[in-house]
Amino acid sequence: MFFLPVCTCCRYYCDYCDTYLTHDSPSVRKTHCNGRKHKENVKFYYQKWMEEQAQNLIDATTAAFKAGKIQSSQYQNKPISGAMIPPPAALQPGPPQRMPLVGPPHMGPMPGPMPGPMPGPMPMMGHPGPMPPNMMMPGDSFFPAPKHVH
């Protein structure tokens, strides 16, 4: 808690709320700390602190990178190969493929109704080739820019 005694007249100051509490009693402090505005102020305080920490980390990383203390990513400046992931079985030509419904060894097919129709084709995941500008490469980290609230 950020309660500081201000004077001997039994008033306490809450740094989060920038306000004085009327009495030096646990019940007054508890009531104040359970209040909606106090909770919002505490949340805002720590949110702002986290944004400052993230910005400090970004600034330190940028300075270290410019000073040559950090090497570029292993994926940077490497061409992306033309290898493709094979399409799912549902997109291959021919009749739909199903896994055989077989139980434990030597038992034959399992009884019961056959499952319904195969699901529709899955959407393509994009074409192979170089990534567009401003796209992150694997291994890159992302720290969003802090939003300054006035």
Curated annotation (Swiss-Prot):
<dbReference type="InterPro" id="IPR036236">
    <property type="entry name" value="Znf_C2H2_sf"/>
</dbReference>
<comment type="subunit">
    <text>U1 snRNP is composed of the 7 core Sm proteins B/B', D1, D2, D3, E, F and G that assemble in a heptameric protein ring on the Sm site of the small nuclear RNA to form the core snRNP, and at least 3 U1 snRNP-specific proteins U1-70K, U1-A and U1-C. U1-C interacts with U1 snRNA and the 5' splice-site region of the pre-mRNA.</text>
</comment>
<comment type="similarity">
    <text>Belongs to the U1 small nuclear ribonucleoprotein C family.</text>
</comment>
<protein>
    <recommendedName>
        <fullName>U1 small nuclear ribonucleoprotein C</fullName>
    </recommendedName>
</protein>
<dbReference type="GO" id="GO:0030627">
    <property type="term" value="F:pre-mRNA 5'-splice site binding"/>
</dbReference>
<feature type="zinc finger region" description="Matrin-type">
    <location>
        <begin position="12"/>
        <end position="44"/>
    </location>
</feature>
<keyword id="KW-0687">Ribonucleoprotein</keyword>
<dbReference type="GO" id="GO:0000243">
    <property type="term" value="C:commitment complex"/>
</dbReference>
<keyword id="KW-0694">RNA-binding</keyword>
<dbReference type="GO" id="GO:0000395">
    <property type="term" value="P:mRNA 5'-splice site recognition"/>
</dbReference>
<dbReference type="InterPro" id="IPR017340">
    <property type="entry name" value="U1_snRNP-C"/>
</dbReference>
<dbReference type="InterPro" id="IPR003604">
    <property type="entry name" value="Matrin/U1-like-C_Znf_C2H2"/>
</dbReference>
<keyword id="KW-0479">Metal-binding</keyword>
<dbReference type="GO" id="GO:0000387">
    <property type="term" value="P:spliceosomal snRNP assembly"/>
</dbReference>
<keyword id="KW-0863">Zinc-finger</keyword>
<dbReference type="GO" id="GO:0071004">
    <property type="term" value="C:U2-type prespliceosome"/>
</dbReference>
<dbReference type="GO" id="GO:0005685">
    <property type="term" value="C:U1 snRNP"/>
</dbReference>
<dbReference type="Pfam" id="PF06220">
    <property type="entry name" value="zf-U1"/>
</dbReference>
<dbReference type="InterPro" id="IPR013085">
    <property type="entry name" value="U1-CZ_Znf_C2H2"/>
</dbReference>
<keyword id="KW-0862">Zinc</keyword>
<comment type="function">
    <text>Component of the spliceosomal U1 snRNP, which is essential for recognition of the pre-mRNA 5' splice-site and the subsequent assembly of the spliceosome. U1-C is directly involved in initial 5' splice-site recognition for both constitutive and regulated alternative splicing. The interaction with the 5' splice-site seems to precede base-pairing between the pre-mRNA and the U1 snRNA. Stimulates commitment or early (E) complex formation by stabilizing the base pairing of the 5' end of the U1 snRNA and the 5' splice-site region.</text>
</comment>
<keyword id="KW-0539">Nucleus</keyword>
<dbReference type="InterPro" id="IPR000690">
    <property type="entry name" value="Matrin/U1-C_Znf_C2H2"/>
</dbReference>
<dbReference type="GO" id="GO:0003729">
    <property type="term" value="F:mRNA binding"/>
</dbReference>
<dbReference type="GO" id="GO:0030619">
    <property type="term" value="F:U1 snRNA binding"/>
</dbReference>
<dbReference type="GO" id="GO:0008270">
    <property type="term" value="F:zinc ion binding"/>
</dbReference>
